[in-house]
Amino acid sequence: MLSDRKKIILKAVVESYSQKRQPVGSKSLIHLPELQFSSATIRYDMLKLEEEGFLKKNHTSSGRIPSFKGYTYYLTHLLTRDYDAANSFPLIDKVIQNKTFHKNKVIKEAIKLLNSLTSYTAMAIGPDVFNNSKISKIDFIPLNHKQALILIITNKGDVQHQNISLDQTKEISIYDLKDIVKIISDLLVGKYLSEAVKIIQSDFVKQTIAKYIRFQEQLIALFIEAFSSFASENTYFAGISEMTKKKEFSDLELIKKIMNLLERKELLKILLNQEGLSFKLSDELQLTPVKDYMILSIPFAIDANEKGTIAILGPSWMKYPKIIPLLEYLSIHLSKLNQE
């Protein structure tokens, strides 16, 4: 439990770092009106905050910067929302209430607006196809004696295909493989995508397929990739190109890493199934190669079966008091789409 004084100092460090983008020392805080403490007191509490894991030392200076624990505490307990953000709410209302847009168009345009208002990459997944779409058909189409096409069709009419080749094996024919896919089809048709992902990875399916072929892991991976692709097509991004124009994003290698992050399926795992406002600092996640970036996300629910997530990807020094109210407002009003 942090003392009131430590809370004030931690809040000041986070917001000073966000504003100046420089490691924070006690001398830079002593002039703040909310910190009526001596430089020695501030320095002592900053040392204690570092020992407790809320701050970390910057090796290139004597100052300190927030750790993920520090950001988490700040965002959960100390953040004061900047209600000047409400000046942008009518722009969000205009998008949400546009009667000419279907739901996915509303989400796409809202993400573009969120990018415009924050200047950071905005993204959305939704509505949640994994819990809203069922597999209606799986087709196996032989192309020749070594290659085939697997088509997976949902009850929403969405289609994904995967190519499969037997060039690496002589253990079965293409027609034997068709029989195996028929076994898988019988297990998956009629199931929600979320159920299908669990079934295809179950020991029962693995053991069943293993009776016929040795490359069952590769076959299962094809199905999982197809299921993930359904969600990928329902994922929207805005503001990726603008990042390259910012001074702090001028490192080409960094841009490549960010692009890889956005394209990887792991991003879906980060954003989906979160409750309430969630924040992930990239260098705390082994899934992401990028350091010093924060993903802020919040879910929305149009109804019980149409759920999604909106998010902002930006540097850890984002101006959270302005950005978080926009995310929260957009989430609330996307959840009212059926009422508009």
From Swiss-Prot:
Keywords: Repressor, Stress response, Transcription, Transcription regulation. Gene3D superfamilies: 3.30.450.40, Heat-inducible transcription repressor hrca homolog, domain 3, Winged helix-like DNA-binding domain superfamily/Winged helix DNA-binding domain. InterPro entries: GAF-like_dom_sf (IPR029016), HrcA (IPR002571), HrcA_C (IPR021153), WH-like_DNA-bd_sf (IPR036388), WH_DNA-bd_sf (IPR036390), WHTH_transcript_rep_HrcA_IDD (IPR023120). SUPFAM superfamilies: GAF domain-like, Winged helix' DNA-binding domain. GO terms for molecular function: DNA binding. Belongs to the HrcA family. HAMAP family: HrcA. This is Heat-inducible transcription repressor HrcA. It comes from Phytoplasma australiense. The gene is hrcA.
